[in-house]
Amino acid sequence: RVPILSLVEDGGGMSIGELAGNRVFWLFAFIFVCAGASEQAMSQWASAFAESGLKVSKTMGDLAGPCMFSLLMGLSRALYARYSEKIRLPVFMTISALLCVFSYLMAAYGPDPVLALLGCGLCGLSVGILWPGAFSLASAGCPRGGTAMFALLALAGDLGCAAGPALVGLVSRAAEGGMKAGL
């Protein structure tokens, strides 16, 4: 049997009202919105981006875009698991966030479609640690957060997951089909 350790004793977690008044909680909620939006915007549009940029079939677009994104996202988590004792999580997440910005710029402004597609894959590598890392940092930053904190942070992340792809679609449509403008 493996014991399950609790961060907070039953009934000892912060209430929703206490969380709402906690600036650290709001910082993490913002991080979750950004993590969800940056992850899902690229992963949801990677297939269409690959199809339109590389002029390949839907099947090839699905393989080239989302598969590369997902594989590199998994690699990011495996790399952090392997080197977590050598690299502090806030440093890794900061590097990942900067890499995410770079990957979006690469995807949107890459002069070559293959280079732009590599930006999509690089985005997977960059966002892989953001969501799980933010949970770990939130646990340390709000040690009494409890179940309500985790639920609200997941909700913030889900809001980002919905808003990110929608925003890409709206901007792309406004730019008359310019997917690069949306990204």
Write out the residue ranges for each language-model feature.
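Juxtamembrane intracellular "pre-TM" segments in multi-pass secondary transporters
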Residues: 2-28
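Extracytoplasmic gate region of multi-pass secondary transporters
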Residues: 22-67, 71-74
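Transmembrane alpha-helical cores of Major Facilitator Superfamily
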Residues: 33, 67-71, 98, 151-159
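Interfacial helix-cap and linker-helix signal at transmembrane-aqueous boundaries
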Residues: 50-51, 83-84, 139, 168-177
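Structural signature of the two symmetry-related core transmembrane helices
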Residues: 91-106
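Paired small-residue
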Residues: 103, 114-122
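Intracellular juxtamembrane helix-capping segments at the cytosolic ends
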Residues: 128-142
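A late C-terminal transmembrane helix in Major Facilitator Superfamily
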Residues: 144-177
